[in-house]
């Protein structure tokens, strides 16, 4: 990748990680369609992706900083017990994070290697679109609840939905948004919980790879460019979070429809072009 491609990839990562349209899917499709020379096995690609993940994680931590201060403070004040609203929500986040974290550690490399072709991505992206459209229908059939009313079993099920993102084309935020709607949350509460769940997963994805970088020596990575890409990814992720939280608060009817139709259109049209 040259510098321009790297910066554009950072924009794609920062935006599509939070929008329910699959960052991994777009990270496969767009470079392929634009004929970018990306070698994912090159030693420089790992530090590049680490910086993008850390940039996105930093954006989420900054945007939800008050939430995290309240959650951690409430949890510590309660001595780890779910005896106040903040401590209880902290436990809900922990319960929702564990399933995806464990599945990611066990299956991530195998699944991503198995389904890394553009054809597989297009199929999963179209299915992601159908999932989002189904989520809107679920919302019409379920009464809206506050996040404080979510059960621990519900949090675990919503968190498990993140595992769908191991398949390139399915969206982490999309799956958790739909799962939240299925458990009676409104769009805004579902989005907030989705982003709170994503924060430790995305942060861990970056931090767990850092020790591997120490064994690569200085290499040929241009660290100035890597830092710039991390910053670009973070800025785009922050802007995306800001937009989406306001969008879901204001749009309480069929909020997922635009994203669902977009994924379905790209997936189906992309598959048709492959057949022609």
Swiss-Prot record:
Membrane topology: Multi-pass membrane protein
Subcellular location: Cell inner membrane
Protein name: Undecaprenyl-diphosphatase 2
Keywords assigned by UniProt, alphabetized: Antibiotic resistance, Cell inner membrane, Cell membrane, Cell shape, Cell wall biogenesis/degradation, Hydrolase, Membrane, Peptidoglycan synthesis, Transmembrane, Transmembrane helix
Top-rank taxon, per record: Bacteria
Family that this chain belongs to: Belongs to the UppP family.
Reactions catalysed according to its record: di-trans,octa-cis-undecaprenyl diphosphate + H2O = di-trans,octa-cis-undecaprenyl phosphate + phosphate + H(+)
Root EC class: hydrolase
Membrane-spanning intervals of the chain: 4-24, 44-64, 87-107, 114-134, 150-170, 193-213, 225-245, 256-276
GO cellular component terms given for this protein: plasma membrane
